[in-house]
Amino acid sequence: MEYLVYLVLGACAGVLAGLFGVGGGIIIVPVLVFSFTAQGFEHEVLTHLAVGTSLATIVFTSINSVRAHHRVGAVRWSLFTWLTLGILVGAGIGALTASYITGDKLQKIIGVFAILVATQMALDLRPKASRSIPGKPGLIAAGGVIGWASAIFGIGGGSLTVPFLTWRSVPMQQAVATSSACGFPIAVASAISFMVLGWHDPLLPPHSLGFVYLPALLGIAVTSMFFARFGATLAHKLSPRMLKRLFAALLYIVGINFLL
């Protein structure tokens, strides 16, 4: 039964990513926490397992997105390069930070983040382009913060990278495309870090590679890669404002549940 949950979750995450332009991690992590709890996984490790698994799935789902954006020349590779230098370091530190946070506290942190993202989507809050692109040190520092936070929340960083780039006067289309590209190094560095940090944890269930649960990774990755395209197509046929409000409502429910 749990394998069907992973396949459906991957499909939903893919559709949501295509519809709203956000990484599937914001919905994958909560559902995995509920699924792992239902399966009787140890409470002390299941949240970290959900975060690590979510990040590992983004490694695969980000590839299709980056290729699509690259074909139309929307990725600012010069920005990507310097952001990535900070991301690689920040993601490793973020995973290490998460390993020192208890499962209950980590759930509350993710719950607060889900509510913040929901509020941003519901009110359509966007930073105004008010500053120019920073120099190399500034991009590296920004990448470090984005990588650190993304590793803790189990996301690909789109909720952080896009606002930063648009604030720095990067056009929205290029900001989304460059953010998608940044999701790959975030996911790779974070997933590897979670694997290493959980490698010898005796509380992990069978078929785990550190804090990455392989059955969930496989099921989610397979379907999300296909359904992301469907979501992107659907986005052009439905009301974006109504869809964002519906997704925001879902995130409010998830966030409040994690905080209770």
Residue positions per predicted region:
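Juxtamembrane transmembrane-helix boundary motif
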Residues: 1-20, 27-48, 53, 62-152, ...
